[in-house]
Amino acid sequence: MTTFVKLRTKAKMPLVGLGTWKSPPGQVKEAVKAAIDAGYRHFDCAYVYQNESEVGEAIQEKIKEKAVRREDLFIVSKLWSTFFEKSLMKEAFQKTLSDLKLDYLDLYLIHWPQGLQAGKEFLPKDSQGKVLMSKSTFLDAWEGMEELVDQGLVKALGVSNFNHFQIERLLNKPGLKHKPVTNQVECHPYLTQEKLIQYCHSKGIAVIAYSPLGSPDRPYAKPEDPVVLEIPKIKEIAAKHKKTIAQVLIRFHVQRNVAVIPKSVTLSHIKENIQVFDFQLSEEDMAAILSLNRNWRACGLFVTSDEEDFPFHEEY
């Protein structure tokens, strides 16, 4: 059974990776080390998570121990929206690279399609609390990122949270040198993303699913929000296969040839979440999970929903 997805660059991206959003400094280092020991090779990072330095320490320690080689790892990071101008993009990238203590990234993504005003704040607002946008677009950012590939600092480029119209704009960009190899999006039984996944795959773009467990620890959860980890149908499927609910939620993506990056800092969960290659969900199981879709999102920069390039107004 294959454990990776092949990108258009011929690189192999492991189907299960470790997410690091919300992993607190002080815990993320041990989590990454435990994950390497458990067999993870794909690590999903981002400038805006403010914990890349510890992730880098963990990777370096494991390389020194000869537990893993750099070339066997698949390290991903993301450019935040306040750095879309080329000079700022270079600075942000250099900080990511030095924090991660690497000399190249396997994949560099545009984290979110809307540009935000440059400055110290990740979410800049005026005195009225309105989010300040940037004149620079994701197309400007892409040009700078392409130079990183040409310099050998990044192996491949991708996007995150893009709808298919935005991907289309990028693919049709005059003078495009490097096509996106991935689109990383929220995906779980309440947001199955069937049309977007179909579109991406038709364009040779791999999909990475974030928040596959419904992001239960997101800081802005409302009490009335649905809880993906408590869906009765998933519990039933898990019991039938003698697997955990999380394992079924992760396996659901693997069987769609979608990479998946569950986040955990709990040792037992880290081990469990990658043990998804020894069972198969039936066609009935898959159909039942897909039927749960309600286009419900746990994540998104909803404060910018009135601005240009907000990605989630479109059907897909």
From Swiss-Prot:
Pfam families: Aldo_ket_red (PF00248). Keywords: Cytoplasm, NADP, Oxidoreductase. Monomer. Optimum pH is 6.5-7. It is found in: Cytoplasm. GO terms for molecular function: aldo-keto reductase (NADPH) activity; aldose reductase (NADPH) activity; prostaglandin H2 endoperoxidase reductase activity. The keyword DNA-binding does not apply. NADP(+) binds at residues 20-21, 44, 160-161, 184, 210-215, 263-269, 273. GO terms for cellular component: cytosol; mitochondrion. Belongs to the aldo/keto reductase family. Changing residue 269 to M: Strongly reduced affinity for NADP. InterPro entries: AKR, Aldo/ket_reductase_CS, NADP_OxRdtase_dom, NADP_OxRdtase_dom_sf. The active site is at residue 49. This is Aldo-keto reductase family 1 member B7. Its EC number is 1.1.1.21. Inhibited by tolrestat and epalrestat. The record marks 78 as: Lowers pKa of active site Tyr. The gene is Akr1b7. The lineage of its organism: Eukaryota, Metazoa, Chordata, Craniata, Vertebrata. It is an enzyme of class 1 (oxidoreductase). Its main location: cytoplasm. It catalyses: an alditol + NADP(+) = an aldose + NADPH + H(+); prostaglandin F2alpha + NADP(+) = prostaglandin H2 + NADPH + H(+). Changing residue 269 to F/R: Reduced affinity for NADP.
